[in-house]
Amino acid sequence: MTETQAGGRRLINATAVMASGTMVSRVLGLVRAMLIAFVLGNGTRQVEAFNYANTVPTTLYLLLAGGTLNNVLVPQIVRAVTHDEDGGRAFVDRIITAFVMALGALTVVVTVTTPLVMSMFARAWTAPDMADHWASLLLMSYICMPQLFFYGVFFLIGQVLNARDKFGPMMWAPIANNVVSIAVFALYLAIWGNQTALTGEPFTVPQAWLLAGGSTLGIIVQTLVLLPFLKRAGFSYRPRFDLKGTGLGRTFHVAKWMVGYVALTTLVQMLVANLASQATSATDQGAGWTVYQNAYLIWILPHSLLTVSLATAMLPSASRYAVAGDRSGVAAETTRALRLATTFLLPASVALLVLADPVTRLAFGNGTGASDYIYIAWALMAFAIGLVPFTIQYLYLRAFFAMDNTRTPFLLQIWISGANAAAALALALPWNDPTTVAARLALAYSLSYFVGVFITHFVLRRRLPELPGTATVRHLARLLLATVPAAVL
């Protein structure tokens, strides 16, 4: 078996393990979202309050720290394992110590400034006539903000395992979180039923504590599940505070561009969240943040099942090629992952476009959500247009990260974020229709990735001359020709 064939077999095997865990986790996540829609609806103020409180900490983590952990640390750990005499053990100990301290400080600051943070994401809710709903949102946000720390620890442990080629645990652990969350909403349904959101009133204090506290508990459980796997992988952590002159400076130098990258994404996310918040601040029901997030949840499912798993398996291998100076190997790994991903995701994007109505009706059209599921269908159709360029862009960026290059992704993100912001403002502001706000914002998101992938391909090809361009276009064209007739029928 050639090295290329072995690499392909290894990539497929690792992807299968991760995809199976991701599939179970995403299915349970969808069940959770369906239960939320059944209990609280899709466009009510109660469901908006819960989702703003619960998703803002997650968004902050993924944008402020998650990108650094996912895309900077793995290549750095692989480099340390390859070159350090102790196999990278001391380096990883220092990485964990430094990031846990930083995450702890960040969590304290964000929790103390919760009113300011939440006003950045949902300014329309600070209006005087929304005072009761704003107070309910803040209570839930205070309870949810500690999730930021536990998300950080979870992803940090997960990346240590990934760098040791132990990919499965990180993809399977979120199942525990979803089980806890489903149990919490089942308890809420048993106590208060599914009519509370229709009253237009904010959550009571016990309701807020149950839902927000349950969400935070789920993240804690998800993190604890990883600890036995870390021990089984032969890793034992020892805090190390001798951080100077140990190579961490290089890691944080690489990470600074990722901080800029995520800062741009954060600003656009805030803009989108604020535009979405207007849908339910002006009326009791509209296609706001929850509709946008639920459509995104369905849209991202095929990407999460395949592309994320492919990229996670690809990154350590591509990083090893990059460390060895083998740019052809990096190009081959990227191309292999891209062809595998698009072979499945282009048909998936067409299917989402055609089947948006029945899929969203089945998932979110029951109970309290029966009257407003169609908002999600419209947003899902808008998202579906951008699935393929989003996937290609995602894999292209991993090639840059494997080559220890985070500066170029930051510069490329300027174009994507700028296009997203401009399109969001152009599509959201001129029309005063609260039922289509989420769909217009989703379309803006999709259009921005067409801009991004076009620019990124030419920039990456300068560094990887063997990266195919015309062959990729022909591959996509053949897939489209094979898929469209089936969709029409």
Where is each model-derived feature located?
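Membrane-embedded alpha-helical bundles of multi-pass transporters/translocases
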Residues: 1-489
